[in-house]
Amino acid sequence: MGRVERRETVETAKRSEIVETAEAAEAAEAMERLGKQILSVCRDELYFSMRFMDVALSSFVYRMDVGISPFGTDGHTMYFHPRELGGLYKENRILANRGYLHMVLHCVFRHIVKRPPGRRAFSRDIEREQNGVPAQKEEEQRAEDKAQRCWDLSCDIAAEHIIDGCDLRPVRWSRSLLRRETYRKLEGSGHTLNAERIFSELAKWNLTEKELAMLEQEFYVDDHRYWESRDENRPPDEQLNNKW
């Protein structure tokens, strides 16, 4: 191959790469537009049934994030995975509506800034500490991890319990047996089912890993990674506190 031919081959490859990059960027923009449209439709459908929630429903900007599953919020922005959100909406738009309202309720009840009430209810090591025997670091970490998981679960159950009790067309959905039984046990306490109360009740159940995982799967709706409470070193967001 001569010098001219090699130069032409390189230039052709560069042009192809530029075209592919432009096409990928265009496709990403189209996916982001579609995701934003879906969330806007969810907001509008919820508004027509819950006009008193107007301000809360309209308090977000929407941003694509392929690292999230399927969506999540930090109180300012709703992040969404375009394919997962699109798939959810295609499966049934009610699921997307419920997800939107679920995230709004996390903000309204300030789940996004609250930290787990504590790990003591999930650790037998406390008894050892009280007797002057220090807990092992690994055991402490397991207790903290379980407390965090149960707190996330408690926040999700609190939001879902409200949504399931709405009986409004945009969010009406059949409940599984596990969900019905979970509500029945929690309601038996006779207390208002806020996240703190649910957390306290879950601690009494002595959940096995399998039982906890089943409940997490049943009530999982959104990704909590952007919650202020997930980063202990993050300073309080005054704008967020004033907003919610």
What is the predicted role of each segment?
Residues 2-14, 18-97, 104-244:
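Short, functionally important secondary-structure microenvironments
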